[in-house]
């Protein structure tokens, strides 16, 4: 009986979603012309390594016609209140989110949390610990640069925002500002990538810890850009399977780094493990100038239908409900 009700709910959801997520924009010889509502569930601001403020990000996403966007800064929720305030009079939905780094088989992987309670005390305590580990790494890198004569300061790394979570992208911008490199990309290739002289690893938490923290905060955990970890398809599936066992709910199938074939394979992987397919541009602004909100790179388009699937999955699993 319960399975039958679930199937009916799923059918109704799919039917209504398909009706609601196409908007009539005109009529041509008696035929309606439609466009698809679009979303972007992976966006960064100056709260971490993006170049636009949360307000600027929201306004840009709205001007581009998005139905919804998620602010997912690295290891911080400090930009969410500003983003929500900027969107209070807009029809576009702003989703509180985050992108948390963790370690898997000596590789750094990222897990997104969508619809998190960004004021949850346990989450804030968890992020404070992660911030300290990142801070220690940053000071070690800064000391190494200064020892070798690079005139880079903490103020340079803040990029005008003392509350920002400093990443390697901030080091790249500081190197560019002082003329040590001609581009952000060159800074990474010459100094900041893992095989370069000024790279320093940091103590990372486990995926299980991240998933537990996101779930406790009512969030919907998603594995970000799964192909960037270069595990191969078998290794990627092994990672997805392990994360699923510990509470993973979604898989970022659509990303600026994927081609259409890769996105299709990831959708099949998501289906195999009963994960919601998600997608986002991974917009950073000036740090990745070829990636735009909502359209990313390589013809990226993420339908709002996928957000409906996420919301249904959350409802069925009781996520976010007290």
Task: Give the residues covered by each predicted segment.
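Intrinsically disordered, low-complexity segments enriched in small/polar residues
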Residues: 2, 21-24, 28, 292-297
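An N-terminally biased module of ancient metal coordination in phosphate/nucleic-acid-related enzymes
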Residues: 6, 22-107, 191-194, 205-288
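Extended substrate/RNA-proximal surfaces in nucleic-acid metabolism proteins
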Residues: 86-237, 241, 298-321
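C-terminal active-site subregion of NodB/CE4 polysaccharide deacetylases
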Residues: 274-280, 285-303, 307-313
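Extreme N-terminal basic, low-complexity initiation segments
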Residues: 1-10
């Amino acid at each position: 009986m319960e399975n039958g009700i679930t199937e009916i709910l799923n059918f109704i959801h799919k039917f209504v979603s398909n009706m609601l997520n196409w908007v009539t924009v005109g009529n041509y010889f008696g035929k309606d012309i439609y466009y698809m509502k679009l979303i972007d569930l992976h966006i960064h601001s100056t709260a971490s390594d993006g170049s636009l403020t949360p307000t600027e990000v929201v306004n840009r996403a709205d001007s581009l016609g998005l139905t919804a966007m998620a602010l997912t800064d690295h290891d911080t929720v400090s930009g969410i209140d500003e983003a929500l305030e900027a969107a209070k009079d807009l029809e576009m939905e702003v989703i509180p989110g985050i992108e948390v780094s963790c370690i898997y088989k000596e590789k750094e992987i990222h897990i997104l949390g969508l619809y998190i309670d960004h004021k949850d005390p346990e989450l804030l305590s968890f992020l404070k610990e992660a911030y300290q580990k990142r801070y220690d790494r940053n000071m070690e890198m800064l000391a190494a640069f200064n020892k070798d004569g690079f005139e880079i300061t903490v103020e340079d790394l803040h990029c005008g925002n003392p509350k920002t979570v400093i990443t390697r992208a901030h080091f790249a911008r500081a190197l560019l500002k002082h003329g040590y490199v001609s581009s952000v990309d060159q800074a990474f290739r010459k100094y900041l990538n893992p095989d370069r002289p000024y790279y320093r690893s940091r103590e990372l938490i486990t995926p299980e810890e991240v998933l537990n923290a996101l779930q406790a905060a009512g969030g919907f955990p998603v594995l970000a850009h799964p192909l960037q970890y270069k595990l191969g398809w078998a290794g990627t599936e092994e990672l997805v399977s392990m994360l699923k066992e510990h509470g993973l709910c979604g898989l970022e199938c659509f990303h600026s780094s994927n081609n259409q074939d890769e996105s299709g394979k990831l959708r099949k992987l998501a289906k195999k493990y009963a994960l919601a397919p998600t997608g986002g541009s991974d917009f950073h602004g000036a740090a990745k100038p070829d990636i735009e909100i909502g359209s990313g790179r390589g013809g990226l388009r993420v339908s709002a239908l996928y957000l409906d699937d996420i919301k249904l999955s959350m409802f069925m699993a009781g996520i976010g409900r007290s």
